[in-house]
């Protein structure tokens, strides 16, 4: 498993790949001991040996991490296959149980049916036996009945013969009676006819005598009537002449009356037309009266509404002014906090540089060895560090994400400077200051007071991809004071981990750990502020990289981060800040860290809904091109899955709250324009109401 200890440091064999189940941190510490023992011969060049050890340790760690990832992926695939097989087995077993229960129920039902049918069969057999007995008795009765029938049939035949003789005799007697009755009818009919003729003759004679007497009397009456009619004719002729004369007179009178009636009709038509015109004028006047009344009412209401709108606009203006003053005060506080943070960072860097000049190289080597071993043995937990005076400060952002832009790297940063800073941090400071970036969210801006809550949110891409990471910067002191400080920090983690579960206060920690910087200053014009860049953070105890790899490994030291805060601003600029813009403000990092753990964390925990705890790791040199291509191909797929999960995450809720707060600010800004718009609406309504009035007047005319 291990190579010989006496071999030179250049020929030290690397340990085989470590499995996560069989090997752990202790095996890595053994490897480091082996490397330290093998490097005893080359004590003449401590900087070169330290550099080689760090490179070898980083390669070992990267190889173990990659193999552990592959094994974990294989184990996860096997577990998924086993889970599918178990699910299939359970489904088949459940189906068999269901079929068995169905068959059992069917058998029980069939047994019940069989028992019922057997009982019915016994009953039917008893009934059949009783019926057989009845059939036998009926057969005996039937035989007796047949004998009685034969006797009765013989008696019936005898009676039928007697009946035939009696019917023949009765027929002969009936024929004789019919002949006698017909003769009697003929004789009676002849007698009746003769009597009727006698009566008719006597009545005819009497009627003829009466007719003769009546005719004589009628002739005498008619002669008298003719005389009277002649006298009446004379009188009628005289009356007719008089009537003709009167008729002519009446005709003349009728013509005169018709002429008068026509004249009266013409007068009546003229009067009706005049009456209709007067009615139309009355209706038009009534309409004008109603329109004038409505206009008066509208004018009164318009004046009232104008007064109300003016009052509302004044109150809204006062509200907006007060809210803008509060926003400005908060923004000024944030700016002062940022300036204080920058001052703390500069002072800490100066202290680090001054202390690094005083330190000596052998102490640096011993401290680096102890540091590496302690970092590998200790699995750093996530610590929610409280705000203290000169160590920590909270930067509050009111309605938008804190813009992290590029910062000009120092020209004199190199591997030696990083090492000196690390030693100074290990010996002098003990604990690093942490910048907690949090965003404040507004709730009920119009009705309630503004309640701001801390929530960490760094927007890294324009597609609203948010990566939240925690970097805990800790380093034990070289002079033996590191152990009690680490125990204190572990006691603080137990309290902070319970607080980290609350999603409403999400703290984003960026460690002030020493890391390798690029000696050449990056051009600010070369990087787009609107381009997409992911924020990745390095942890403490990071080993410097060679000069050839500095162009590829860009570290995420807090000195590379700029928090831009504007100075004095006008009202329009303040309103433009709080407007929801299409181009989202983007957190952009100047350099891209190549920490192996940070890359893995960004690969596997790219969703914005999860807090990514970054464990301490060492910066790796130039990665192989094949591995980078695989990582670049795997990142977009995971980002798409992260976007699907992002809708249900607490960070998405925070983004929605930010959007709502921005919308409220825009509504407050637009509320000042309400009186003008209301007046325009009232004018348009009045114009629309005046147009139908004009149409009604035209129709009435």
Curated annotation (Swiss-Prot):
Coiled-coil residues: 61-197, 241-342
Record keywords, A-Z: Coiled coil, Cytoplasm, Cytoplasmic vesicle, Nucleus, Repeat
Motif LXXLL motif 1 boundaries: 654-658
Tissues where the protein occurs: Highly expressed in testis, not detected in other tissues (at protein level). Expressed at low levels in the epididymis, lung, spleen, bladder, kidney, liver, muscle.
Disulfide bonds: none
Gene Ontology CC entries for this record: acrosomal vesicle; nucleus
Domain notes: Contains 2 Leu-Xaa-Xaa-Leu-Leu (LXXLL) motifs. The first one is essential for the association with ESR1 and ESR2.
Quaternary state and interactors: Interacts with ESR1 and ESR2 in the presence of estradiol/E2. The interaction with ESR2 recruits CCDC62 to ER target genes, including cyclin-D1/CCND1 AP-1 promoter. Interacts with GOPC.
Identification of the protein by name: Coiled-coil domain-containing protein 62
Recorded name of the encoding gene: Ccdc62
């Amino acid at each position: 498993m291990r190579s010989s200890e006496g071999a030179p440091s250049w020929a030290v064999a690397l340990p085989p790949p470590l499995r996560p189940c069989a090997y752990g941190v202790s095996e890595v510490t053994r490897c480091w001991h082996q490397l330290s023992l093998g490097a005893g011969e080359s004590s003449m060049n401590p900087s070169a040996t330290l550099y080689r050890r760090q490179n070898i340790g980083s390669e070992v760690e990267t190889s173990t991490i990659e193999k552990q990832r592959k094994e974990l992926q294989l184990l996860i695939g096997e577990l998924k296959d086993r889970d599918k097989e178990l699910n299939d087995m359970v489904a088949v077993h459940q189906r068999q149980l269901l079929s068995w229960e169905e068959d059992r129920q069917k058998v029980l039902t069939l047994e019940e049916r069989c028992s019922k049918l057997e009982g019915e069969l016994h009953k039917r057999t008893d009934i059949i036996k009783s019926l057989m007995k009845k059939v036998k008795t009926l057969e005996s009765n039937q035989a007796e009945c047949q004998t009685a029938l034969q006797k009765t049939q013989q008696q019936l035949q005898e009676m039928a013969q007697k009946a035939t003789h009696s019917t023949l005799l009765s027929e002969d007697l009936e024929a004789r009676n019919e002949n006698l009755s017909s003769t009697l009818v003929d004789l009676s009919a002849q007698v009746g006819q003769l009597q009727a003729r006698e009566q008719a003759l006597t009545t005819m004679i009497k009627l003829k005598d009466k007719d003769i007497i009546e005719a004589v009397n009628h002739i005498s009456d008619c002669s008298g009537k003719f005389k009277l009619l002649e006298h009446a004719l004379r009188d009628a002729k005289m009356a007719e002449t008089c009537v003709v004369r009167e008729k002519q007179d009446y005709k003349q009178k009728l013509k005169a009356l018709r002429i008068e009636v026509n004249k009266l009709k013409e007068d009546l038509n003229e009067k009706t037309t005049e009456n209709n015109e007067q009615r139309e004028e009355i209706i038009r006047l009534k309409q004008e009266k109603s329109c004038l009344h409505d206009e008066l009412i509208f004018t009164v209401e318009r004046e009232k509404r104008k007064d109300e709108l003016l009052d509302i606009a004044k109150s809204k203006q006062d509200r907006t002014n007060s809210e803008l003053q509060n926003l400005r005060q908060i923004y000024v506080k944030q700016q002062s906090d940022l300036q204080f943070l920058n001052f703390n960072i500069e002072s800490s860097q100066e202290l680090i540089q001054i202390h690094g000049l005083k330190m000596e190289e052998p102490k640096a080597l011993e401290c680096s060895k102890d540091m590496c071993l302690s970092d590998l043995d200790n699995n750093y937990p996530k610590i929610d560090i409280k705000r203290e005076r000169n160590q920590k400060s909270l930067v509050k952002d009111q309605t938008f994400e804190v813009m992290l832009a590029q910062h000009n790297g120092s020209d004199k940063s190199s591997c030696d400077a990083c090492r000196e800073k690390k030693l100074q941090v290990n010996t002098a400071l003990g604990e690093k200051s942490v910048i907690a970036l949090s965003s404040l969210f507004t709730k009920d801006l119009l009705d309630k007071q503004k309640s701001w809550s801390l929530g960490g949110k760094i927007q890294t891409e324009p597609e609203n991809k948010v990566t939240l990471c925690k970097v805990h910067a800790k380093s034990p002191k070289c002079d033996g004071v590191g152990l009690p400080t680490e125990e204190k920090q572990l006691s603080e983690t137990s309290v902070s981990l319970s607080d980290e579960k609350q999603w409403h206060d999400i703290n984003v920690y960026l460690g002030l750990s020493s890391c390798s910087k690029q000696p050449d200053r990056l051009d600010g014009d070369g990087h787009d502020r609107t381009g997409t860049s992911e924020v990745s953070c390095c942890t403490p105890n990071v080993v410097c990289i060679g000069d050839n790899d500095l162009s590829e490994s860009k570290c995420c030291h807090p000195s590379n981060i700029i928090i831009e805060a504007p100075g004095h601003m006008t009202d329009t600029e303040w309103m433009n800040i709080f407007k929801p813009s299409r181009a989202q403000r983007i957190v952009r990092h100047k350099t891209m860290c190549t920490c192996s753990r940070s890359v893995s964390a960004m690969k596997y925990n790219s969703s914005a809904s999860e807090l990514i705890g970054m464990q301490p790791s060492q910066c790796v040199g130039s990665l192989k091109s094949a591995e980078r291509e695989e990582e670049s191909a795997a990142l977009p797929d995971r980002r798409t899955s992260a976007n699907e999960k992002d809708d249900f995450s607490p960070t998405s809720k925070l983004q929605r709250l930010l959007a709502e707060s921005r919308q409220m600010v825009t509504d407050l800004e637009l509320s000042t324009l309400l009186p003008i718009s209301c007046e325009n609406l009232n004018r348009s309504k009045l114009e629309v109401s005046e147009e139908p009035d004009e149409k009604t007047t035209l129709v009435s005319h």
